[in-house]
Amino acid sequence: MSLNKNYLDVPGTTIFDADESRKGYHLNQFCMSLMKHDNRERFKSDQRAYIDEWPMTEAQKQAVLDVDLNRAISLGGNIYFLAKLGATHGKSFQQMAGSMTGMTEMEYRDMMIGGGRSVEGNRVVGENGTAQAHHQPQGQPQGASNKRAK
C-alpha cells in the first residue's frame, strides 16, 4: 500500500522519508564513515578507491566525486550526513547550502539573515517563486519523477 505523499508538491524541498532513507542508506553510511580521521584521510588520498568500497549506485558515487549535494539528495542523501562530506572538503555548512541554491556564500547568508525565501510563489510546484526548479541550479523539481498525479 503506497502512501499519498502530498509533500512532493513543495518546491525545492526533498522530504527525507522512509523511501529516501532506504534509497540512500549506503550513501549516508559512507558519509558517516567520514567522521573518523583515518577514513577521511583514506578518502582524500584516493576518493574513487574509497567510495568503491561502498555498495552505492554509480550515480551516488558520481555525486560524491562531484560534490553535487543536490544530486546526492535526489539519490537519497540526507543533508545532515552529507555535511560530513562537505566538512571533509573544508566547506562550512553555509558554503554548502549556498552552493545548493546557486548563490554565493554571502548571498545565501544575507538571504537567511533577511528571513529566508519568501513563501510567495513557492507554496506548490508550478508557481513562479525563487524556490521553483527553473530558478535553481539543479533545474528539475525535487521528486519530479515521483510527483503525485493531480
Question: What residue spans do the PLM features occupy?
Answer:
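Charged, low-complexity intrinsically disordered segments
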Residues: M1-K150
